[in-house]
A protein has these predicted regions:
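Conserved donor NDP-sugar-binding/catalytic core segment of glycosyltransferases
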Residues: 248-296
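Short, well-formed alpha-helical segments that are part of the catalytic scaffolds
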Residues: 164-182
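Conserved donor nucleotide-binding strand/loop of the catalytic core
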Residues: 204-220
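Short beta-strand-to-loop acidic/aromatic patch adjacent to the donor-nucleotide binding site
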Residues: 232-245
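A recurrent flexible, glycine/aromatic-enriched loop bordering the glycosyltransferase active site
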Residues: 298-325, 372
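Active-site donor/metal-binding and catalytic loop motifs
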Residues: 139-147, 360-376
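Donor nucleotide-sugar recognition loop
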Residues: 320-325, 330, 334-351, 357-365, ...
């Protein structure tokens, strides 16, 4: 039997909500450590119709070649096992029972197997429930098949690392223990660490292959790993972040889907869930919109059964997948990454290579909230990537660029984040230097002197909220007052004596709106999840300085727009090549 999907019990990532693993509908359970399974109490009902443990018939039927499907369960005790099928017409309590079995497992017979092959003709999602009569022990379970894989897969996991050892080393240990030492995978999966910070020792690396690398960001690091895989005859590549944790089953599931895939140019994008809110989706695939993106299913609670149904059956077109978890066939790569350093490289890579990208529930990572990460440096990197990407790929009009840029500047200065506004302007200046800018400055080292004066501002530090005692302002402005706010540019066109000298609390977000800080001098941008923040201060001089600089630059950009667009489109395809990157790293195949 070939295992397609293992049962998970929330034993490895203890901070993750148990609702992603099982739904206790009656009674209770006792999770055991590591791979020891769970104990179900007497007269309990447990549903495994959860994010990690349901089986997507739609995914396996549509994208893979399976001739049969079986389910195995290991444990001890007496219980009723029921399988339920739910289709796109889901309503509460409308799941159809398709299998019901009385199961008794003892010391002599601790494995139960049932043939589910007839369900391969069905559409929908499959999950099971267990009703116990006495106390039961479930050691493990899996959906499996007798069908041999249709594709040979040698998967290289590429992790680009830079000063994140506290995340990286535990990830290496988990992959070593559960994958590289597993007879089923050790000859078909390799772990490559591209060490941009050059600080991983051989002892820390263990069985991973470490490539000491110049710091050319994620773009250069992932490309260096991809070149290694090409040179060592790997068939498939999986890009993963060094600071995102995941269930190893996400990697195994990715590997199995690639083995059984019957779809040309298939790529698998992992979902990102928040590490602090582990049931909330940050992004489950994305679509490109000129100078922005659409994060699919953002904000949905994946612990809810109706969300599982919606995200499984509602297949939106995915145009690119972020590199926190992105798997693809190496021979499908026609364009190598563009040297963005970070931000935008995954977007352009997905768009230019025209992968057939899917997301699968149960394949995910848990990452830091991007709202917390926002600041001058991320803003600089994001704006320059967005402008360059649009010049390379999009046919949108000049007015889209003008509108987006002015909006970014205004939102920053109206909310007292003048360093972010300056970072936005510097980004546009660098984009206007043309494609040669990107090949000359592969690293940020030579750029830091230009942007260093804005990096120290808006820095999140530890905050004693009780000592500062900021005011929580209730924002309820009628239409007339909103009109006044807009006409006075959030009070910047009013005399300074209108401004109140007090401290107002505002949640740290990527998008801040001026209404909540109208006529206030001091704003504490604060993240309650991390107990960090900074104070932004009303400054009319900086406001007008950044506004006029922004207007000056966008006029210059408009004058050069057609020429810039032509230069990027002519020269970028020559940069996104294997030849370019081998020259960068000065080695041949």
């Amino acid at each position: 039997m070939h295992v397609l999907q293992n049962l998970l019990f929330n034993n490895h990532l203890s901070d993750i909500s148990e609702k992603l693993y099982f739904d206790i509908q009656k009674g209770g359970i006792q999770p055991l450590s590591e791979n020891d399974g769970i104990i179900l109490e007497k007269n309990s009902r447990i549903s495994f119709g959860t994010y990690f443990n349901y089986f997507s018939l739609n995914t396996w039927r549509k994208y893979c070649q399976l001739k049969d499907l079986h389910f195995q369960l290991q444990g001890k005790g007496e219980f009723v096992l029921r399988f339920w099928l739910t289709d796109k017409n889901y309503q509460p309590s409308s799941s159809k029972r398709v299998i019901e079995k009385q199961v008794y497992l003892n010391k002599d017979q601790d494995c139960f197997c049932i043939d589910c092959s007839f369900l391969l003709k069905k559409q929908g999602i499959l999950h099971f429930t267990i009703d116990t009569k006495g106390e039961c022990f479930i050691q493990g379970g899996s959906f499996c098949t007798k069908t041999d894989p249709v594709n040979y897969v040698k998967l290289g996991i590429v992790i680009t690392h830079y000063n994140r050892k506290k995340y990286l080393i535990p990830a290496i240990r988990r992959i070593e223990t559960q994958l590289l030492s597993n007879e089923s995978f050790k000859n078909n999966i390799g772990l490559i660490i591209v060490d941009n910070s050059q600080d991983v020792s051989s002892e820390e690396a263990g069985e991973a292959i470490v490539i000491s690398n110049l710091n050319y960001g994620g773009s250069g690091g992932f490309t260096r790993g991809l070149l290694y895989l090409k040179d060592h005859h790997y068939t498939h590549c999986l890009f993963m972040d060094d600071d995102a944790s995941c269930e190893i089953e996400s990697i195994i599931k990715t590997f199995r889907l690639l083995q059984y895939s019957a779809v040309e140019r298939l790529a698998i994008a992992g979902t990102m869930l928040y590490e602090k809110e582990s049931t909330i989706i940050h992004e489950k695939g994305a679509q490109y919109k000129p100078l922005s993106l659409i994060q699919l299913y953002c904000g949905l609670d994946i612990s809810k059964f109706e969300t599982i149904i919606a995200t499984d059956l509602d297949k939106k077109k995915i145009e690119y997948g972020a590199w926190w978890h992105f798997a693809f066939k190496i021979e499908d790569v026609n364009y190598f990454p563009f040297p963005f350093f970070v931000k935008g490289d995954d977007m352009l890579f997905g768009l230019m290579n025209h992968f057939n990208i899917i997301t699968v529930n149960g394949i995910c990572v848990f990452g830091e909230d991007f709202r917390y990460k926002d600041g001058p440096l991320p803003r600089y990197l994001s704006v320059r990537a967005n402008f360059a990407l649009a010049l390379i790929y999009s046919d949108c009009s000049l007015w889209i660029y003008v509108w987006r840029y002015i909006r970014w500047i205004l939102i920053s200065i109206l909310t007292y984040r003048y360093a972010s506004a300056r970072a936005t302007s510097i980004a546009l200046q660098h984009v206007m230097r043309g494609p040669e800018f990107w090949t000359r400055y592969l690293s940020l080292t030579d750029i830091y002197p230009v942007i260093s004066n804005v990096l120290s501002a808006e820095k999140m530090d530890d905050v004693d909220i009780d000592q500062l005692k900021p005011i929580i302002r209730q924002v309820r402005f009628p239409i007339l007052k909103k009109i006044i706010i807009i006409m006075t540019f959030n009070g910047f066109f009013l005399p300074d004596f209108f401004i109140r000298d007090r401290l107002i609390l505002s949640k740290k977000e990527i998008k801040h709106f001026p209404y909540e800080i109208f006529l206030e001098k001091n704003i504490l941008y604060y993240s309650s999840e991390y107990n960090k923040g900074y104070v932004a201060i009303y400054n009319k001089k900086k406001f007008f300085s950044e506004l006029f600089l922004g207007l000056k630059l966008i006029i210059q950009f408009a004058a050069r727009f057609k020429k810039l667009k032509r230069e990027y489109r002519q020269k970028v395809p020559k940069i996104m090549t294997e030849k370019f990157w081998r020259k960068v790293y000065q080695f041949k195949r």
